[in-house]
Amino acid sequence: LVGSEMCIRDRYDAGCRSILILERDVQLGGILNQCIHNGFGLHTFGEELTGPEYAARYITQALERKIEYKLNTMVLSISADKHITAVNREEGLIEIDARAIILTMGCRERSRGALNIPGYRPAGIYSAGTAQRLVNMEGFMPGRRVVILGSGDIGLIMARRMTLEGAKVLVVAELLPYSGGLKRNIVQCLNDFGIPLKLSHTVVNIEGKERVSGITIAEVGPDRKPIPGTEMEFDVDTILLSVGLIPENELTKQAGIEMDPRTKGAIVYENMETSIPGVFALSLIHISEP
């Protein structure tokens, strides 16, 4: 298993006793470890849990079944005949011949470079997930006056989180005429804290050379292009980008697995098997982008 897929317990209980998890992070659990807000586990466990609590339930189940795992282990390559090459500090280069491989590498966030926003490259521009990790796990505050671009759930949650940590979130701008986040998150993360949501708006300029000093947003038309004369300027030191996810599929492509050009993920059958027999793709490596 490449990555921290939470339901590995089900594979074990179905009769697969020889399982090895290869995780590049320092702990199991994946992105859940930095999601300290509640709302997890309602359907699975019948109670409301934080992300780390939710992950801990599955980690405990894996440990009870004595499922093997290697942390700080980076998978370098996967071949079509299911040969895995990985590396870590303790063992050096690791070669594994597997009978089956489950790919659960997740996603990475789309960066500022993919948006073509005019301006320099000053400090103070973060993806929402990076800011979440800095605040929730590393104990660092990215900034004090914030604009957030994108109204997906991570952007909404970080608007609330930054506010609770003492920052001033001036606005959440969304390119589309609707929010991509859950209605409850719009209410609990924006409305309850008086944070305005500007739909059909985007960032058109980032000011500042060493550090972000200002942001300009503008309304966009049906063609998603800025409308002249609708610009609004904000005096900020930080911008958080919540503008979509890109599947971590470098290993998938390297193995020669057939990819879906629309979702950027692997093409799979109903049992999640890819075009290579014995190689399965699960989790967020199937994320769909509009």
Residue ranges with predicted function:
Residues 1-8, 289-290:
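Short, small-residue-biased leader/transition segments that mark boundaries at the very start
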Residues 4-5, 27, 107-109, 152-154, ...:
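Residue-level detector of alpha-helix initiation sites
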Residues 9-16, 132-178:
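Rossmann-like NAD(P)H-binding beta-loop-alpha module
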Residues 16-31, 174:
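Glycine-rich FAD pyrophosphate-binding loop
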Residues 25-48, 183-184:
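Conserved N-terminal glycine-rich FAD pyrophosphate-binding loop of Rossmann-like flavoproteins
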Residues 56-88, 96, 163-253, 258-260:
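A Rossmann-like FAD-binding core segment of flavoenzymes
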Residues 56-145, 222-229, 240, 267-270:
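FAD-binding core/adjacent interface of flavoenzyme oxidoreductases
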Residues 103, 125-134, 237-286:
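FAD-site-proximal beta/loop scaffold in flavoenzymes
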